[in-house]
């Protein structure tokens, strides 16, 4: 009887969460700029009905009836951005930064410094209180949220896999992908070598959020999933902080190949993974207190030097 009672309680709790989700108010989205596949003919950008490897922002001007296109390059700018989960309590202050197309920008700092919050603003999980965030010169408030997020590839520390085959989990990044595209993405992510050793290879069934795989293997699948989506901008949120050093190298190699040619924002506790970044932003209490390359920040002998060397006496 007690077991049945516990099952009933668990069912009621689950039902309560489902009904709470159904009662949620849909997100307000005032965006009107959309993301489309495009081709370039001379100096003219045109919309394409099929995947071309080139993306463009489609801007329809209601006042003139004219539609223009702007190539998606991956230029991201934060201009004096303030943000607080509660408007009365600002947690990010005067954030200024720019990422040029193809650059790797790393955020480092203590827990709670604001690293993940910044990346959550890029994909508009939250809206800012002050300032502007521009994507290829377009205020992100003008971009439809679904299209904005479609342009971003996200690899998180906690990888979520669903019940299905390995191939289906990778293909989730691009539902119409061919088998050959899945194989290519897995090879780029360094996942092919372990997948082919599984009992049924790419047809191996995964259950329980991939419980039969190691943390490193799950992350390799997440990289493959991002690779097949072919996003122009990447967000890697502490993606190697939960695996052993040996596996980390394989994951990092896969990430390096994925990052090639893409604007990338990286958050990591292991500073060795961000040494080759074009710019490292050091955050403390919601402010950028240092910025520069690995070598430049070590020369400063400030907060980054302290984090990197473990020297608590660094000023």
Descriptions of predicted regions:
Residues 24-27, 200:
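Flexible, glycine-biased helix-capping/connector loops in cytosolic signal-transduction modules
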Residues 38-315:
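ABC-type nucleotide-binding domain
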Residues 28-39:
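Solvent-exposed, non-transmembrane helices and loops of integral membrane proteins
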Residues 1-23, 30:
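Cytosolic ends of transmembrane helices, especially the final helix of ABC transmembrane type-1 domains
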